[in-house]
Amino acid sequence: MSACRGFLLRRINDSCLTFRRHKFKKKWATTLPKIPCSRLALQYFDINYSMQFGDLWPSIRISLLTEQKYGALVNNFSHKETVLNNLSALKAKDFISEAQSVISLLQTQNNVDTSEKMVFTEVPLNLVGEKNDAEQTQATNLLSSLSNSKLTCFTFSRGDISRFPQSRSDCFGLLEYYLMDAASLLPVLALDIQHGHSVLDLCAAPGGKTLALLQTENCQYLAANDLSTSRSSRLHRVLHSYVPRDQRAEHKVRITSWDGRLWGDLEASTYDRVLVDVPCTTDRHSLLEEENNIFHRIRTKQRQMLPLLQTELLVSGLRAVRPGGEVVYSTCSLSQLQNECVVQRAIELAATDHGVLVKPQDLSCFREVFKNTFNFFQDCRVGELVVPHLTANFGPMFFCKLLRIK
């Protein structure tokens, strides 16, 4: 027995390692530490936006990484007066009403006769500036439209980081206001919808801008489209929560899930106004959220193809608007490649491939009228860009207005 035990102990002491080959070796993609999508987005933005914005980038960067400010878009179909009183009690202010006061003050300063065709000459705040007659008329009409806007959106003052409470339902089951990035209303205001217009919202979901279009109370007919059926379902829910049934009847509002790139073939030269709020890198979301992040490795190809998709959607929108109608292109990205470059490329393609001639419209008056609420980047070649700032943490929001001539 003792001999057997001694033999076993010797075997244990004399044991050695043996190497085995496995059928598969571990892949490097599963063994390397995973970098969060938000970190990848930040690295990408640091490389690109530091070159684009220079010394402004550190300020924009910290603002993007900080909690966003919201605006409360008042539901005109609810008990508006009660809602206005409640929001005013929170020390919030209607930024659109404040802009209208600025316009009124400028008209008074320049002794403008509002009964005649308004021409802003020698405006000290350079709302119109040195423009030809056509551009002057366009700027004047846009300011006049802003003065008469029925949209109401409350925001807290610069530096005030208060939050709005969740909206409540009124006695008819409609929510009182919609919380959104207040800068998202600027493309809707730029669209200058007049009474009786037919309007196309080409990429409508999740529904904030679509709701704002209906709140103008000027849309005779609104077509709201989004390729994603799940996002279209969310759009349905938003409209059901804020808009009475008779105001979203089939002859007034149509919701579809078609490929927006085909709209120029489906309904060419049909609409008075078209909003093209395209899919983009959604810069703020990409920095703060991991879920559904465009910077996920499996979505690399999709992200790289964004400028092409955006260009195709804008060309489709330009074809869908009638001659004399207007298109507003917008993104929630700071990227010059997704903003100005897309606009310029779409203008070229629309002309060469489809014979559609368009002209960018001057929106510089927005910078002056809304400067108390938003921070604007001053060096866009076309369009306007709201950049986040710690005291006014809205955006990013790029928007550009295009007039179809032919």
UniProtKB/Swiss-Prot annotation:
UniProt superkingdom: Eukaryota
Q: What positions does the entry give for S-adenosyl-L-methionine binding? A: G207, G208, K209, D226, R231, D259, G260, D277
Q: Does the keyword Transit peptide apply?
A: yes
User: Which Pfam families does the UniProt entry name for this protein?
Assistant: Methyltr_RsmB-F
Which keywords annotate this record? Methyltransferase, Mitochondrion, RNA-binding, rRNA processing, S-adenosyl-L-methionine, Transferase, Transit peptide
Q: Which GO terms describe its cellular component?
A: mitochondrial large ribosomal subunit; mitochondrial matrix
Provide the protein's localization.
Answer: Mitochondrion
**Single GO molecular function:** mRNA (cytidine-5-)-methyltransferase activity
Record organism: Xenopus laevis
Return one Gene Ontology term, BP aspect: rRNA methylation
Protein family: Belongs to the class I-like SAM-binding methyltransferase superfamily. RsmB/NOP family.
Q: Which cysteines are joined by disulfide bonds?
A: none
Just give the chief location class: mitochondrion
Protein name listed in UniProt: 5-cytosine rRNA methyltransferase NSUN4
Q: What does this protein do?
A: Mitochondrial RNA cytosine C(5)-methyltransferase that methylates cytosine to 5-methylcytosine (m5C) in various RNAs, such as rRNAs, mRNAs and some long non-coding RNAs (lncRNAs). Involved in mitochondrial ribosome small subunit (SSU) maturation by catalyzing methylation of mitochondrial 12S rRNA.
What reactions does this protein catalyze?
a cytidine in rRNA + S-adenosyl-L-methionine = a 5-methylcytidine in rRNA + S-adenosyl-L-homocysteine + H(+); a cytidine in mRNA + S-adenosyl-L-methionine = a 5-methylcytidine in mRNA + S-adenosyl-L-homocysteine + H(+)
Active-site residue list: C332 (nucleophile)
Q: Give the E.C. number(s).
A: 2.1.1.-
